[in-house]
A protein has these predicted regions:
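Catalytic histidine-centered segment of alpha/beta-hydrolase-like enzymes
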Residues: 234-243, 247
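Gly/Ala-rich beta-loop-alpha elbow adjacent to hydrolase catalytic centers
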Residues: 91, 95, 99
Length: 258
């Protein structure tokens, strides 16, 4: 099982195919298996890299509070480990925010940026300022099995197979690790840094994603060289709900910037 060490954590990763590199970063509570349909689609023409963010899947999490700055540092450590000067990076939700912060903090390393259902802030509006702290508390009180089932049911409307994957991904997380990671994730803020993104950017949003859609127009307006596309028949698990449309959008974008 390929791993690397980064900032006190052992990180799992997987490389498939040869060619220009694309790195996919998964959403919170999920893992690298989220991208199976993308790996299968792109592996014949690109070097496809997936990994488990610290505290998720097969990656470890050091004791103590989690510093969200380590997320983007880990992604760069992965690139260094694989001797990649630049890459196209893609992420969904938390993984998108990690990718966004990587493009802001390490602009010379990012050739293109793909953000799927991605927030730039956890205090974007009054609702989030009230709801996110409540969500942090509730995540400490609700058992992981129940949290997993709630999320799986909500995100299985367009693809029933999502239910099994999401509950399995949740089962790999301990309650302690999840709460420490979630505390860090929900404090990530990039709203004031969007203008610092220097690479071409594609924003993808599911037409039924009511979790992050309110931020997408703002991000498109403030990321200089960006375009936005809506993915039909998709909720927040956009690449799981409509992988064909997501794959085509990513393929077209990469071809355009190559």
């Amino acid at each position: 099982m390929p791993t690397l060490e980064s900032n006190g954590a052992t990180l799992f990763y997987q490389v498939t195919g040869e060619g220009s590199p694309i790195i996919f970063t998964h959403g919170a509570s999920w893992n690298h298996l989220q991208w199976n349909k993308q790996v299968d689609y792109f592996k014949d023409h690109y070097k496809v890299i997936v990994w488990d963010v610290r505290g998720h899947g097969y990656s470890s999490l050091p004791e103590g509070p989690v510093d969200s700055e380590n997320f983007s540092a880990d992604l760069i450590a992965l690139m260094n480990h694989l001797n990649l000067e630049t890459a196209v990076i893609c992420g969904l939700s938390m993984g998108g925010h990690i990718s966004l912060q990587t493009a802001v903090r390490y602009p010379e390393r990012v050739k293109g940026l793909i953000l799927i259902g991605t927030p730039c802030s956890n205090t974007f509006n009054l609702y989030e300022k009230i709801f996110v702290p409540i969500n942090r508390i509730s995540s400490k009180l609700i058992p992981m099995k129940i949290s997993g089932k709630i999320q799986a049911k909500m995100l299985s409307r367009f693809n029933p197979e999502n239910y099994h994957y999401i509950t399995e991904a949740f089962s790999m997380l301990s309650h302690d690790k999840w709460n420490r990671v979630w505390s860090a994730v929900t404090r990530m803020e990039s709203k004031k840094d969007l203008h610092k993104v220097k690479c071409p950017t594609l924003l993808l949003i599911g037409d039924q994603d009511n979790m992050t859609n309110h931020q997408q127009t703002y991000m498109h307006q403030h990321i200089p060289d960006s375009e936005i596309k809506t993915i039909a028949n998709a909720h927040h698990g956009t690449n799981l709900d409509n992988p064909d449309a997501v794959n085509q959008a990513i393929f077209d974008f990469i071809k355009k910037i190559s």
